[in-house]
């Protein structure tokens, strides 16, 4: 079997998990893409508060994997973790549906708001545990597939595995984008046309079906060793890190521990006995020292292994930090881009209005349409130019996406300035409509499409980057680092909105950049601010890439994947 045949397709278990990931995205995007509209139109929040609520919720959802992933890697079984988290996810969506139903029949919003936040928290908890576990479970299937099928010479095998790995992440992301596309387009129309009860009920039904689909594949999955077995036979990387940190803390405390006051006068300094030649004493064992020596040796191995694992994770954080502004920009389509679209001309014919959230589908649609071109055109060209088996590197891929996101936000600022200028001119006319600007919503398409193209480069690159740069048995943690970029980015976005809002409306005649009246808001200035900060992050990222060395380049020993 030649290299091309071996890199052609994935196993049935990988394909099934990709379908499940697409169903999960359908449900999540069906709720998240239009949530800001629900909060402003139904719950009656201000624009800034609704945007901060959505960003905080998205951040909380994306940050949870950082806490759940170590537990999943160390103690939990991935299969049952996926089942349990999917069930919590389903309960949260049922609660969200009940909230919309109760709110539509109650004049008071107190109970409805309480259950709204509770339901959103359940969705966050379920999704925050499900996502990294599902991806890591898919990686288990991939590793088994690679070890089973590849028996090539070392150089060819490395390129073949890299190609198959990239193919897996691209197909995974293709499935995720397909689900997102369906969720944004179909659910936004249903929510705007048939109401929020049905709009929240359908995602719950989809998650319930995904649980049934997942359980149908029990016979074809490859299962990693259970948590109990792992705990008995070997120490996990996360446990080694904890032991290393605990050992350092205990050591520091022992240094500064003084003797009791009554013994201070009798203190005597003694030098520790050490052999002159370490090599001659390593093989000598005595009954009094053998057990202690073995214990010290095991402790030493744990310490050094802990140091290695800590270094492997910590060295990723400079790159992780520079990706945050990319994540901040990606919060805009679900918040301010959608609010912009509400004020623009959305009619197609006389009877149909485009739901503003539907434009988010152009991001995923551009990904679905352009990703094959990436594989068939860009990768072969870069392979010929760089004369290697992989083409564009993961670091270069993320950098291209960051650059395109900056271009997208610059275009967004220019379009918003044009919308504001038309709005100001319309105020002088007698038939002025403050809720609609005679500017087609399709003016927003370029910024959406560019964000979709940048997504192909950066998001898929981030998945592969964090997957490849952590120890194999910390893989769930690697996926958690990827999702945490968007989690912290959401919190950074909410913090920026609060700071800018406080600054722009604090004194004098300054107008709130996020005013509820979109004809008075200055989102263009906010977009220019994001363009500036993103450019700074991009420049620093390029600088860091020159000094970053991949773990594979360093020759780090990797633990073997479960078979």
From Swiss-Prot:
Record-linked InterPro entries: MFS_trans_sf, POT_fam
Keyword Disulfide bond among UniProt keywords: no
Modified positions (Phosphothreonine) in chain numbering: 81
Name by which UniProt lists this protein: Protein NRT1/ PTR FAMILY 5.9
Family statement: Belongs to the major facilitator superfamily. Proton-dependent oligopeptide transporter (POT/PTR) (TC 2.A.17) family.
Segments passing through the bilayer: 56-76, 82-102, 110-130, 168-188, 194-214, 317-337, 362-382, 394-414, 441-461, 479-499, 528-548
PANTHER family registered for this protein in UniProt: OLIGOPEPTIDE TRANSPORTER-RELATED
Keyword field: Membrane, Phosphoprotein, Transmembrane, Transmembrane helix, Transport
Highest taxon listed in the record's lineage: Eukaryota
Stretches of the chain forming a coiled coil according to its record: none
An annotated Gene Ontology molecular function: transmembrane transporter activity
Topology in membrane: Multi-pass membrane protein
Cellular localisation: Membrane
One Pfam family, short name: PTR2
Organism: Arabidopsis thaliana (Mouse-ear cress)
Organs and tissues of expression: Expressed in roots and flowers.
An annotated GO cellular component: membrane
